[in-house]
Amino acid sequence: SIIKTGYAVHISRMSGSGRYLFVIGRDAKINMIDLWMEKPDNVAEIRVGLEARSVETSKYKGFEDKYAIAGSYWPPQYVIMNGDTLEPLKVVGTRGMTVDKQEYHPEPRVASIVASHFKPEFVVNVKETGQTLLVDYSNIDALKVTTIGTARFLHDGGLDSTKRYFMVA
């Protein structure tokens, strides 16, 4: 059967448990599909903006599927959600300075997001500013974000086969 999702699905990610498939359309609509149901279907959905490209779930031991995260092009932000319901818990803007010329950029888009298997962190790539953010979700009420300067306009990324290294182009 066909499961209705957002417009032009850009990426799909499996949850840490393998039970859920998260998809995000270019219209920023996230669908959480339960693959263990007799007939897989949507169990939660949310729209996190007007345009988006990336969704992921927490993978670190003890935090498997506890959180989901999505990054949007517009507005320039990422949203951390409850992994069971997609209820928004934190909305964090990405506006800021570029790494090379230290110029303010008002609309830096979140391109790719992956979840570390070694730490309670999301790796968030911010395209126009040339920043990769390590978002520590171990204390959702007091997020710790480490910013790594990279090249500007890096777009799509993922983990290598060991799941230790983030590669982005």
Residue ranges: model-predicted function:
Residues 1-169:
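Predominantly soluble domains enriched in secretory-pathway, periplasmic, or organellar proteins
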